[in-house]
Amino acid sequence: MGKGTLYIVSAPSGAGKSSLISAMLERNPTYAMKVSVSHTTRNMRPGEEDGVHYHFVAKEEFETLIAKGDFLEYAEVFGNYYGTSRVWIEETLEKGIDVFLDIDWQGARQIREQMPKAKSIFILPPSNGELERRLNTRGQDSAEVIAKRMAEAKSEISHYSEYDYVIVNDDFDTALMDFKAILRAERLKEEKQAAKYKGMLDALLAE
């Protein structure tokens, strides 16, 4: 059995990254795929579940994990730690399961340095106008917050060229097909196929 592939997925807020990852998992139940769940020291919010949205841990435990080198990357945001578990990702990949890692461009850089075989995907909105419309449609944020998110989006988008693949999420179903095509192509690479079909290949080449 071959190893799984780590997919780094980045996008500005409102580009549809989370929806695409969720749809990929729901519509392709035969694919061995999981989403990486980050560790955090922030308090759990209503509706969140430990181990599903985040692994909620105490600050002391998080700092112990840092000292042990258990994180591929971590950052402190507004006084709370967030980190990606190296151990969980490596164990999952060893089982032949692909892992999606939803992370920003800065975290993506850190991950690529440590796991150069990871594949990276950047998801773009079709226009600034459409991105702003999607953010407004959520109905969650004030005009001030949306303006801030739009500025952050421009900064995030400026790093799209650092990624292996780029998907434009104009039509959701088309973007989802593009997403699946990337996974399919990666699974058909020689290295993956040679591991998957080792017995068959040995038989084909036997004298």
Curated annotation (Swiss-Prot):
- Top EC class per UniProt? transferase
First-listed, main subcellular location of the protein, grouped into a coarse class: cytoplasm
List where in the cell it is found.
Answer: Cytoplasm
Record keywords, A-Z: ATP-binding, Cytoplasm, Kinase, Nucleotide-binding, Transferase
> Pfam family of this protein, just one?
Guanylate_kin
**Record protein name field:** Guanylate kinase
Q: What is the protein's species of origin?
A: Vibrio parahaemolyticus serotype O3:K6 (strain RIMD 2210633)
Q: Which reaction does it catalyse?
A: GMP + ATP = GDP + ADP
Guanylate kinase-like domain boundaries: 4-184
